[in-house]
Every structure is written in structure tokens, then in C-alpha cells.
């Protein structure tokens, strides 16, 4: 029996790094069913500052709809992501961020963040602009308190 346990350990050590991304993707960071919603702690960090808040995402048959609100209740942005066209549409953006070049960057980064979250990662970094996005899921147990 000890001879087989060595082989089992070797197989597990080899397969574990290959299986972990699949398990993380299966766990899913995005809402998985129509009508399901998820809450996330959001942290957007830039060179000169950052923003934190809460994001609520809702999935329907066409895609995802999300809204980010800071701790004071001020809406930072509302967006939607269409599965079919693989595009993000910004519905509203906070006044100081409502510039065409910021909206374009947000649109592109949110699209890449959705792809990263689909693959099991909760963060995305825009190296060109030096912006780091982190969407950490909030457990339902944490919101019940």
C-alpha cells in the first residue's frame, strides 16, 4: 500500500497546478445564471490616487449589468456588458471622470476585467495607464450581518 501512495502523491502534485485554474473558473466570479446578482468590493488604484466602493452585477439573457457606488453612496459608474458582441457600454460615469478618454479607457478595461473574471481572476492591471482594478466577491454571509 505505501508504494501506491507515493504514486498517488506524485500524480496529485503534477495534476494539482493544472486543475486549480479549472476549479477557480468553475467556481465563477461572475453571476452564472440569468437573474443572479453578485456583490463585489471594488478597488481602483492609480498613480495619483484611487477609489473604493461596492459593485453589484446582475446577469440577464443578453449580458451583465453593473453599477459601482463608493462608500458615501455616490455612483461612480453604471455599465453593461453584452455577451454576443463582447462590448461594454457605459451608461453613466461620475462627473469628474466623464471625459471621452477616461470613458474609453474604462470601457476597454471593464471588458478585459470581465474576461479575467470569467477565467477566475478578480484583478486586472492596465500597464499602459498604471491602473489596477480589483473586484473581490462579497460573501452572502458578510452581507447578512
Residues covered by each model-derived region:
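Mature, soluble, non-transmembrane domains
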Residues: 25-29, 41-50, 54-56, 74, ...
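N-terminal beta-strand/beta-hairpin edge segment
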Residues: 54-72
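N-terminal presequence-like segments and adjacent domain-start helices
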Residues: 22-36
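N-terminal secretory signal peptides that target proteins for export/translocation
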Residues: 1-6
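Bacterial N-terminal signal peptides
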Residues: 11-21
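Short, hydrophobic/aromatic-rich segments at coil-to-beta transitions
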Residues: 34-41, 61-67, 119-124
Amino acid at each position: 500500500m505505501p508504494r501506491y501512495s507515493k504514486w498517488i502523491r506524485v500524480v496529485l502534485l503534477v495534476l494539482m497546478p493544472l486543475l486549480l485554474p479549472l476549479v477557480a473558473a468553475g467556481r465563477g466570479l461572475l453571476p452564472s445564471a440569468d437573474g443572479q446578482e453578485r456583490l463585489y468590493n471594488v478597488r481602483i488604484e492609480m498613480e495619483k490616487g484611487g477609489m473604493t466602493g461596492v459593485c453589484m452585477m446582475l446577469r440577464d439573457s443578453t449580458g451583465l449589468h453593473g453599477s459601482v457606488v463608493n462608500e458615501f453612496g455616490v455612483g461612480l459608474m453604471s455599465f453593461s456588458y453584452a455577451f454576443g458582441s463582447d462590448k461594454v457600454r457605459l451608461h453613466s460615469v461620475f462627473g469628474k471622470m466623464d471625459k471621452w478618454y477616461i470613458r474609453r479607457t474604462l470601457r476597454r478595461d471593464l471588458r478585459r476585467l470581465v474576461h479575467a473574471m470569467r477565467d477566475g481572476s478578480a484583478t486586472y492591471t492596465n500597464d499602459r495607464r498604471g491602473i489596477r482594478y480589483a473586484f473581490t466577491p462579497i460573501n452572502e454571509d458578510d452581507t447578512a450581518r
